[in-house]
Amino acid sequence: MIIGIGSDLIDIRRIENSLERHGQRFVQRIYTEVEQARSENRRARAASYAKRFAAKEACAKALGTGLAQGVFWRDMGVVNLPSGAPTMALTGGALARLEKILPPGHKAAIHLTITDDFPLAQAFVIIEALPVEQAPH
């Protein structure tokens, strides 16, 4: 069953401006080490960071909190499954919120799609509650 859905659309130029104005302070405040490693050496660095920013916003919406109630930027990070598909890794307040909204006997599957077409980046997140016997391992 779907227990959360969120989407976000961001102007990549907004992230470009933040990167230029605030540099590493911005990057370290918002992005996990894994996200930084994936984005830093990309030719389209700002687009890579913008997609991850949109994913965090979409995930926070899917959790039902937005970036509030103890859910912080670095509590949510875009990671890739062995197949290469993106998903979200949650820690801290985001993980606590996920555990709170999961029905007993269920595990979460977080589905994420991210895309960009300059000047926009977009993300959709669906949080699915699967019975433990069906949950991916």
UniProtKB/Swiss-Prot annotation:
Q: Name one Pfam family in it.
A: ACPS
Keywords attached to this entry: Cytoplasm, Fatty acid biosynthesis, Fatty acid metabolism, Lipid biosynthesis, Lipid metabolism, Magnesium, Metal-binding, Transferase
Q: Which SUPFAM superfamilies match?
A: 4'-phosphopantetheinyl transferase
What Gene3D superfamilies does the database record attribute to this sequence?
4'-phosphopantetheinyl transferase domain
Q: Which reaction does it catalyse?
A: apo-[ACP] + CoA = holo-[ACP] + adenosine 3',5'-bisphosphate + H(+)
Chief subcellular location equals cytoplasm
| A GO CC annotation given for this chain | cytoplasm
UniProt-listed InterPro entries: 4-PPantetheinyl_Trfase_dom, 4-PPantetheinyl_Trfase_dom_sf, ACPS, Ppantetheine-prot_Trfase_dom
Subcellular location field: Cytoplasm
Top-level enzyme category: transferase
One GO molecular-function annotation for this sequence? Answer: holo-[acyl-carrier-protein] synthase activity
Cofactor(s) needed: Mg(2+)
Q: Name one GO biological process term.
A: fatty acid biosynthetic process
So where does Mg(2+) get bound? D8, E57
The protein's Enzyme Commission number:
2.7.8.7
> What function does this protein fulfil?
Transfers the 4'-phosphopantetheine moiety from coenzyme A to a Ser of acyl-carrier-protein.
Similarity comment text for this entry: Belongs to the P-Pant transferase superfamily. AcpS family.
Q: What is this protein called?
A: Holo-[acyl-carrier-protein] synthase
* Natural source organism: Mesorhizobium japonicum (strain LMG 29417 / CECT 9101 / MAFF 303099) (Mesorhizobium loti (strain MAFF 303099))
Taxonomic lineage is: Bacteria, Pseudomonadati, Pseudomonadota, Alphaproteobacteria, Hyphomicrobiales
